[in-house]
């Protein structure tokens, strides 16, 4: 939740954290799925992609390189929607550079 939130992305649901049937109905409202650990959630993400056309990211954000890739993939997917809804794209590269500059 923290990593996408810091880059300006609202998190719809974190599954299985605190999940219940009440909240599962909101899953199709997401713009994409993030699967930071393939052991948990990959089957749900592939189902959502097949059933709802919802893309997913399956990169474990550990280490500088993978974390940067994870954020950049989020940026690409968010920009698809941002350009449709507001005709404005967001630059996530600057966020990645700021987060990794002094490491």
From Swiss-Prot:
- Explain how, and how many, cofactor molecules are bound: Binds 1 [4Fe-4S] cluster per heterodimer. The cluster is bound at the heterodimer interface by residues from both subunits.
Q: What does this protein do?
A: Component of the dark-operative protochlorophyllide reductase (DPOR) that uses Mg-ATP and reduced ferredoxin to reduce ring D of protochlorophyllide (Pchlide) to form chlorophyllide a (Chlide). This reaction is light-independent. The NB-protein (ChlN-ChlB) is the catalytic component of the complex.
Which catalysed reactions does the entry list for this protein?
chlorophyllide a + oxidized 2[4Fe-4S]-[ferredoxin] + 2 ADP + 2 phosphate = protochlorophyllide a + reduced 2[4Fe-4S]-[ferredoxin] + 2 ATP + 2 H2O
PANTHER family in alphabetical order: LIGHT-INDEPENDENT PROTOCHLOROPHYLLIDE REDUCTASE SUBUNIT B (PTHR33712:SF7)
The Gene Ontology biological process annotation of the record reads: light-independent chlorophyll biosynthetic process; photosynthesis
The molecule here is called Light-independent protochlorophyllide reductase subunit B
**Family stated for the protein in its record:** Belongs to the ChlB/BchB/BchZ family.
Q: Pathway membership of this protein?
A: Porphyrin-containing compound metabolism; chlorophyll biosynthesis (light-independent)
**Major localization listed first in the record, in broad terms:** plastid
- Could you cite one Gene Ontology molecular function of this protein? 4 iron, 4 sulfur cluster binding
Indicate whether 4Fe-4S appears among the record's keywords: yes
Tell me the domain of life.
Eukaryota
Instruction: Give TM segment ranges.
Output: none
Report the coiled-coil segments.
Answer: none
Main EC class the enzyme belongs to: oxidoreductase
* Subunit comment: Protochlorophyllide reductase is composed of three subunits; ChlL, ChlN and ChlB. Forms a heterotetramer of two ChlB and two ChlN subunits.
Cofactor names from the entry are: [4Fe-4S] cluster
For this UniProt entry, what's an example GO CC term? chloroplast
The EC code for this enzyme is 1.3.7.7
Q: Where in the cell is it found?
A: Plastid, Chloroplast
Keywords in UniProt for this one? 4Fe-4S, ATP-binding, Chlorophyll biosynthesis, Chloroplast, Iron, Iron-sulfur, Metal-binding, Nucleotide-binding, Oxidoreductase, Photosynthesis, Plastid
Tell me the Pfam families matching this sequence.
Answer: Oxidored_nitro
Q: Which organism is it from?
A: Claytosmunda claytoniana (Interrupted fern)
